[in-house]
Amino acid sequence: MSSPSSHQLHPASVVTSAGAPLRLYGKRIAVRPLVATDFEAWSEVRHRNGEWLSKWEPIKSAYLPDPSTNRDAFNNRCIARDRERQTGGSYAFGIFIEGSFAGEVNINNVVRSAMQCGTIGYWIDEARAGKSYMSEAVLVVSKYAFEELGLHRMEICIIPRNHNSRRVMEKLGIREEGLAERFLEINGVWEDHVRYGFTVEEWRQRHNQLSAEWLQ
């Protein structure tokens, strides 16, 4: 799958400078910000994967409407993600395979100043797991982070027993840096996380090999 010229992508907008929707491409996947009309597809995938995903995610608030069942809540979620993109705090994308919604990949917690870093988070439909789609999506947004957003470092934090997610890092050859104890509260438990790091220097050194394997 070929990509449009990446220099036209505006890092803080849902559209490019030419007015076209923001889309990023790998060999087999496309990623773009979710919009209100994605509700049915997003809701179906989230419901079908409830058990698969819940053990790796924070507990949902009982006091807020569930965006997987409430269209207005989903629309508000999209608006909030757009606002975060506009302010440069995070960049959220839906993953699409042959036009069908399959998961999400996000650049979260963007810090500028001396750090110039962000954290990548992701999830995928269990029916699509094991086919390297997520490795491709992580590389697509890493390229965007380094080349369009000008970030210096990306970090990915994974619960040690989440072997599927750690396999994503292994396929891309992203460095394991160590263990952060009781790092995030996941499903009601303060979980240790393995921290992985990927810097722009590593991206430049491995650009040709990674692009040929995953992007071109």
Predicted regions and their residues:
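GNAT-family acyltransferases
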Residues: M1-A127, W190-Q216
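A short coil/beta-turn micro-motif at the C-terminal edge
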Residues: A36, P160-N162
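Short, contiguous, well-ordered secondary-structure segments
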Residues: V105, V110, M134-V138, S142-Y144, ...
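Conserved acetyl-CoA-binding loop-helix of GNAT-fold acetyltransferases
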Residues: Y122-I124, G130-E147, H163-K171
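Conserved GNAT acetyl-CoA-binding A-motif
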Residues: E147-C157
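Conserved catalytic-core motifs of GNAT/GCN5-like acyltransferases
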Residues: C157, R175-D192
